[in-house]
């Protein structure tokens, strides 16, 4: 009797093992079947394209793209990577759906990855709704250019997020400028914006935003910082760190940080929430999730809104922000405008007023990346509404108001870059309301910065492929 039971048990175990192997093999095949790939494509566009690009271009440099199989991609999708802001999707997708999504991503990258990097047709005339122009490539071969500023002699300062500062002069790039501080150059961190003091001709100050690395810590931690320095030859000197955000964290995203001067001796910039939205943006005892205002020497203005609030950081000008990526002053009203990234949907365009609460994360028009509800509130007493919000997200970045007479049909329009959707966006504004939007240069690359040059032309910095473009109007 015992032998019969034992034999039966062995047979049952063998049958189960065969069934498990069949199911396992079948599940592996499912990921590549047309129906499942179609579902994976839909899931990618719905959940992933906003950050990684609709054509999968952000995956081209991932190390796991060259690995056999999909185990690394599967793990990243299922469990996420908190330090870089990659959410976990284990509650959103089943394992077969994750496997299909991982297979879709790997299958979608062409062998020639340069095909993922769109180029502008040289000399081709771009016809927008009200303005014709030609796109001229001024500088190429850059590594994720971020900031862009012009010296009085016409030389161009370019920051690369990897931590290099370059000078473009007479058609050539300099070696990296010496004298920069230690940086947390990982993820979204590194060397960020560059801005010349309005009286640069007299004082020579150049301002830099960057993710400062704590060199005393055993693990890499840091936060947004602002340094000013002077330039001589190919080196910086008189370096002064005038701001360093607190607390420091090991997360390498949501640093902000564009710089703007108001013409009255004040510098404005945004410090992102550092990926901890429930901890920082609504509290005044930390720097994160805030717009800051300083005097140009780093001291705190006497009329800052929270300077007399017990426990508050004195440089805070407004709070309740997620990740401000664009900062500029309106050329007529003098108002401070910012663009900031929402989560999935809910990117915002805001006019910043002192002491106001802009709501994040209590109110938002977006949801979590994995599709779950972030908040049920889109408005609340005591919290500001955006001038405009984008659904779906465009990932708005550096921006500027068009000035001068070279682009008469765009005058005082707002131009801002889109990172994930890879276009330049023109926004028509009247009485602080958005009347119209136009997408320009679709597929040009991740538009990181938009700058009005001293020559009156519009310049764009493109992350991938790394280059600086100039828009030449055609009459």
Regions found by a protein language model. Name each.
Residues 1-38, 96, 116, 124, ...:
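N-terminal export/targeting leaders of redox proteins
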Residues 34-54, 71-79, 139:
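Sequence/structural segment immediately N-terminal to covalent heme-attachment motifs in c-type
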Residues 44-50, 55, 85, 97, ...:
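Short pre-active-site segment immediately N-terminal to redox-active cysteine/selenocysteine motifs
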Residues 50, 57-111, 190-191:
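Extracytoplasmic electron-transfer domains, predominantly the class I c-type cytochrome c fold
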Residues 98-100, 105-277, 326-329, 335-342, ...:
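Acidic, Gly/Ser/Thr-rich repeat motifs that build Ca2+-stabilized beta-propeller blades
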Residues 113-134, 236, 299-309, 365-380:
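Blade/loop signatures of beta-propeller domains
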Residues 224-233, 284-296, 352:
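Beta-propeller blade signature
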Residues 434-454:
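Conserved blade-ending motifs and adjacent loop-strand segments that build the rim/top face
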């Amino acid at each position: 009797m015992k032998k019969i039971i034992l034999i039966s048990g062995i047979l049952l175990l063998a049958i189960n093992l065969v069934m498990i192997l069949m199911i396992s093999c079948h599940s592996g095949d499912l990921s590549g079947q047309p129906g499942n790939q179609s579902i994976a494509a839909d899931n990618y566009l719905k959940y992933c394209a906003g950050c990684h690009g609709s054509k999968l271009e952000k995956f081209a440099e991932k190390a796991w793209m060259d690995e056999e199989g999909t185990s690394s991609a599967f793990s990243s999708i299922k469990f996420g990577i908190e330090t870089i802001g990659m959410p976990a999707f284990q509650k959103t997708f089943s394992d077969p759906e994750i496997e299909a999504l991982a297979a879709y991503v790997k299958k979608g990258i062409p062998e020639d990855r340069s095909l993922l990097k769109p180029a502008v047709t040289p000399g081709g005339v771009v016809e927008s709704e009200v303005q014709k122009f030609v796109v001229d490539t001024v500088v190429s071969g850059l590594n994720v250019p971020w900031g862009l500023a012009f010296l009085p002699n016409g030389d161009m300062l370019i920051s690369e997020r990897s931590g290099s500062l370059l000078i473009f002069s007479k058609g050539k790039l300099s070696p990296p400028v010496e004298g920069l501080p230690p940086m947390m150059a990982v993820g979204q961190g590194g060397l960020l914006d560059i801005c010349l003091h309005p009286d640069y001709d007299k004082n020579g100050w150049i301002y830099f935003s960057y993710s400062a690395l704590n060199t005393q810590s055993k693990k890499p931690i840091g936060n947004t910082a602002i340094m000013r320095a002077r330039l001589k030859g190919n080196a910086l000197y008189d370096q002064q760190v005038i701001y360093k955000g607190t607390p420091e964290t090991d997360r390498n995203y949501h640093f902000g940080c564009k710089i703007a001067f108001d013409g009255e001796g004040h510098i404005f910039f945004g410090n992102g929430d550092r990926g901890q939205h429930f901890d920082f943006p609504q509290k005044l005892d930390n720097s994160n999730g805030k717009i800051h205002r300083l005097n140009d020497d780093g001291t705190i203005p006497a009329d800052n809104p929270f300077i007399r609030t017990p426990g508050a950081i004195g440089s805070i000008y407004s709070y309740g922000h997620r990740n401000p990526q664009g900062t500029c002053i309106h050329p007529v009203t003098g108002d401070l405008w910012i663009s900031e990234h929402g989560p999935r949907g809910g990117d915002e365009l805001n006019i910043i007023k002192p002491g106001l609460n802009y709501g994040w994360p209590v109110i938002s028009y977006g949801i979590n990346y994995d599709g779950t509800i972030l908040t049920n509130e889109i408005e609340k007493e005591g919290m500001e509404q955006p001038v405009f919000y984008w659904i779906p997200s465009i990932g708005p970045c550096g921006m500027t108001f068009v000035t001068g007479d070279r682009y008469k049909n765009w005058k005082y329009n707002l131009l801002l870059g889109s990172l994930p959707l890879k276009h330049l966006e023109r926004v028509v504004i009247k009485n602080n309301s958005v009347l119209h939007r136009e997408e320009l240069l679709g597929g040009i690359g991740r538009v990181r910065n938009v700058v009005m040059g001293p020559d009156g032309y519009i310049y764009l910095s493109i992350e991938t492929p790394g280059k600086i473009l100039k828009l030449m109007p055609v009459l």
